[in-house]
Amino acid sequence: MDGKTEMTMTTDVEAVVRRAYHAAEGNVMDVQGFIDLFADDGVINASTKSFRGEHLGWVVEFLHKFTPDIHRELHRVVVLGNVVAVELSIRGTFSGPVETPAGVLQLTGAKLDTPGADVWYVEGGKIKEFSCNVDRGSMLAQLGVHPDFASAVEAQAAAR
């Protein structure tokens, strides 16, 4: 492949990923447009769960629900063939309460500025796989949620 063709392919792959980020911006929030960028068998791997089909939009809808001004600041974008790696910060302001297994957190006005690293695999102009990696510990600390090591130690002792 000559350099010109390779550059066009790389640029097209990056453009698909940038369109996905744009569709997920708080001031845009085009969930269907985001989903339409994925291949029919496309998948999002986010933390401990994977999402496919109609559930692809849940990932962006979930954060937008609590941070309607969500913005992803892209610090570094690296393209290698059909793979795009992105170092970013996810920023926004929480606009309301968040339900948790332990009760409701009142987070109105809390600021979010969490680092992350995403890896995208694009085939035939469509996203085949998106691995979303967010520094969950940093995010929780910013929201005043800290690990409860005492409960973990007690639960482990009780299980013996």
Model regions: which residues?
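Low-complexity, intrinsically disordered terminal/linker segments enriched in charged
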Residues: 128-160
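A solvent-exposed, acidic/Ser-Thr-rich amphipathic alpha-helical stretch
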Residues: 11-15, 31-96
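Short, surface-exposed loop/helix-turn segments at secondary-structure junctions
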Residues: 96-107
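Short, low-complexity N-terminal intrinsically disordered segments enriched in polar/charged residues
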Residues: 1-40, 150-160
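Short, surface-exposed coil-to-beta transition loops
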Residues: 71-73, 112-117
